[in-house]
């Protein structure tokens, strides 16, 4: 894609999200979602092949359905209250309709069907935007309407999401699908705490975005898309591969890495609100995510896959990719745990 066209499309994606973030009027929120959705489709189709076309079509159809449901909820709310204000959501039918629409946009279970397929069908850079930036706008609206949402509906979707996110990733060898299922599980953790502490949900989102950005950037640095290709990178770039494994273990929530913080704080919040069974269930399902990341770490670092290469180290050209953002992302993704007491006092 030519740089001027890419600049226009990316600025539209960013503008759409910012419009959703700053709007207090439902119509401008809906317009922001539409701008964002229409601009992201060309980014998903950056590599013009049948797989990318299929992924873009699945994404477009799902998001269009979610937008229609969102507009339906907005109209129901307008008819009953006569107001377009985002914070004014007294009717349970309107709030439930909007919650389902936002769940479809986020890829929460049982509306998760599109997330692994779309992520697998697009390039790594497009998948990175899909699993990070595209989560901000729906979660910001969910944050604003959280006092009006149905806790039982949110808890059901959260429980299904953490279960599907852990279970679905167990038999995957494609790194993009593993990250997609991990995204579903993380969204489940965020949704679980929305009713009780929405600010904690936004902290979880920030840490999740940092970890996922770091993982995708390291994958793009060495062009890894499968477990096999990642194991071969160990010969070429052992330091980079070890950083990938550290961030992936952080995504799995292994202490003492940063990914343990949101899980710890969310379980603490749920326990404080007498949701003992839900907290226990989520802690157990988190082990599924940790298991497939540990398995990936073992397969990459502690075993050597069959290779036609007879030399231990490979000849390599000088890397020309921009890595400016990687050091701070890696530090944030792995070393934030000592700051947890301060975060607990804030949230």
Swiss-Prot record:
Transmembrane region(s): 5-22, 26-45, 60-80, 150-170, 178-198, 200-220, 242-262, 274-294, 324-344
Quaternary structure and partners: Core subunit of respiratory chain NADH dehydrogenase (Complex I) which is composed of 45 different subunits. Interacts with TMEM242.
Enzyme class, first EC level, given as a word: translocase
Record bears the keyword Transmembrane helix: yes
EC numbers for this chain: 7.1.1.2
Protein function: Core subunit of the mitochondrial membrane respiratory chain NADH dehydrogenase (Complex I) which catalyzes electron transfer from NADH through the respiratory chain, using ubiquinone as an electron acceptor. Essential for the catalytic activity and assembly of complex I.
GO terms (BP aspect): mitochondrial electron transport, NADH to ubiquinone; mitochondrial respiratory chain complex I assembly
Protein name: NADH-ubiquinone oxidoreductase chain 2
Family designation: Belongs to the complex I subunit 2 family.
Keywords tagged on the record: Electron transport, Membrane, Mitochondrion, Mitochondrion inner membrane, NAD, Respiratory chain, Translocase, Transmembrane, Transmembrane helix, Transport, Ubiquinone
Membrane topology: Multi-pass membrane protein
UniProt-recorded Gene Ontology molecular function terms: NADH dehydrogenase (ubiquinone) activity
Pfam family, one: NADH_dehy_S2_C
Compartments, as annotated in UniProt: Mitochondrion inner membrane
Reaction(s) the record says it catalyses: a ubiquinone + NADH + 5 H(+)(in) = a ubiquinol + NAD(+) + 4 H(+)(out)
InterPro entries per record: Complex_I_Subunit_2 (IPR050175), NADH_DH_su2_C (IPR010933), NADH_UbQ_OxRdtase_chain2 (IPR003917), ND/Mrp_TM (IPR001750)
Entry annotated with the keyword Translocase: yes
CC per GO annotation: mitochondrial inner membrane
